[in-house]
Amino acid sequence: MKPAALPTKEWIIQQAATLFNTKGYYACSLSDIMEATQLKKGGIYNYFRNKEEIALAAFDYSFQLVLQRFRSKLNLAETSWEKLHIIIDVLASMAFEPVITGGCPIFNISVEAPRLDPALALKARQGMQMLTRYIEIKLEEGELQGEFSCSRSYEEIASTMVGCLEGANIVARTLNDAERLHWAVNHVKEYLVQNCQKP
């Protein structure tokens, strides 16, 4: 039931975000959104023109939740090295402690990206690029500040980290086995040590 103080548009976005993140974009229908929000088609179309528009708003909402978790954790870190480890831990936490039901919205939408509406596919790419770019920035900052020296390109290290954790999230959730995720986290942290040697 919609909280009285919550605007209807926000209610639709929040309910749709959970649906898209659990069922997937293609499997989620307007009827599903109507059932979750307890609104009729006209009540939804008062705010959105179509399912694609709802999906875009829902992903933006989900992505902001991801960013909020990163910010709250990263505020506790002082060095780039600490921030890189926090990024790894936050990404891993999305499997069994997601910011929204269904797992990491960035990873989930990326799986569907090749088949998505172009605007939504662009959102998926931008989300993934923003994540990897942030890691690259932390690697560069750490090197400039003399915390460590990277033996590979920032792009390669960041892409490897994200790819490994994305795959581990999927495997761990599919098998409902958190230990497999812990293995991947340890592997990525070891990879970071091997390729970002401290002076």
Predicted segments with their positions:
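Basic, helix-initiating cap at the start of DNA-binding domains
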Residues: 1-23, 27-39, 53
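C-terminal peripheral helix-coil segments that are non-catalytic and often amphipathic
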Residues: 2, 86-94, 129-141, 145, ...
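Amphipathic alpha-helical segments enriched in hydrophobic/aromatic and basic residues
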Residues: 20, 29-30, 41, 51, ...
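Short hydrophobic/aromatic patch on the recognition helix
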Residues: 38-48
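Hydrophobic alpha-helical connector segments
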Residues: 57, 71-102, 154-161
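Amphipathic alpha-helical packing segments from all-alpha helical-bundle domains
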Residues: 72, 118-144, 156
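All-alpha amphipathic helical-bundle segments outside canonical DNA-binding/catalytic cores
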Residues: 82, 122-126, 144-160, 179, ...
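Amphipathic alpha-helical segments used for helix-helix packing
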Residues: 83, 97-119
